Amino acid sequence: MVTVYLTGEPSEEVARATCSDEVIFLGYKSSQVRGLKLKAIAQIREILARGTFKFCIAHRSKPTYVALLASQLPVISIHHNYDDFGRFTRRFLVNLFRSRLLLLGVSDSVRDEMRASLPKWPHRQIETLYNRIDVAAVQSQFLSRQAAREFLGLPPDSWIIGNVGRLHHDKDQATLLRGFKNALGSLPADSLLVIMGKGPLEKDLKQLALDLGIAQSVVFTGNVADGRKYFKAFDVFALTSDHEPFGMVLLEAMAAALPLVCSDCGGGAEVVRGVGTLFPFGDDQALAACMLAEYRNRENVNAAQILQQLQERFSDEAVRSRFWDLPFVRRLLNNQSI
């Protein structure tokens, strides 16, 4: 297996984490892979000429474009965001090569949006392959609850709701703050909301916390390197995003066996459903009710159920098994027509 990174500087750390027989960094800047990408196509052709390959996996639209034009191989194109086929040119390209192309969305939500954009495609060529984590590797990085709280400067005994993500409209931390405000009167007085991350709304969100009268109960940590190491500092993890394509941070929270509260939209809801609490996006009253429910249930958290769902649906092993069982992939391995 050969893995090629179109963009980014060479990195030994990335190469080691890639788990590939060979890792090649082409070193393009993002601005250099706009347009026709003829040089990148030529380089991929040179790489392909050195060996015998069964198929190509391409993450996102630009690598898919390069893979399709550089080879005659079947291409498995993985999509991590919505509206990847909003442009006519992208729809035209994949329609041109439909006979040797499988599209995978990282959630049913992304998959369904692609199917709506490409209504003439058979459903068997637009499927779901969830994101995944190495559960044991992630868990090995966690600090203990006490150590994590000490590092973040948090009190040892407070009940803490955690949120991790960019401070951006898409993450809707404004609803998170309002929901916490609504719940706080029924929570212990020393309860905290901890928001880990930075972004363009940092100043506005801090002002909102002041306006709501909860600034003393909200901690903005800013960016924290290797933030997931400190997830055990939290008692509950809350994600309030608007139509999240997936929500990798939820998997990391599940690895810490944290109770989950999530907006009922996008891929995040698919991750949480069955082991967490969902609320309508933007509904701070419903979010407050979820927070209170999690507090009242704090002695009865079913950590085993959370970890079981993580292992069975979103672990490396589960997603790898799902990939090799995809009908498109099975036909490739059996040298059957796709």
Language model region names:
Residues 223, 242:
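Aromatic "clamp/platform" in nucleotide-sugar-dependent glycosyltransferases that forms part
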Residues 274-284, 293-299:
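Conserved acidic donor-binding segment of nucleotide-sugar-dependent glycosyltransferases
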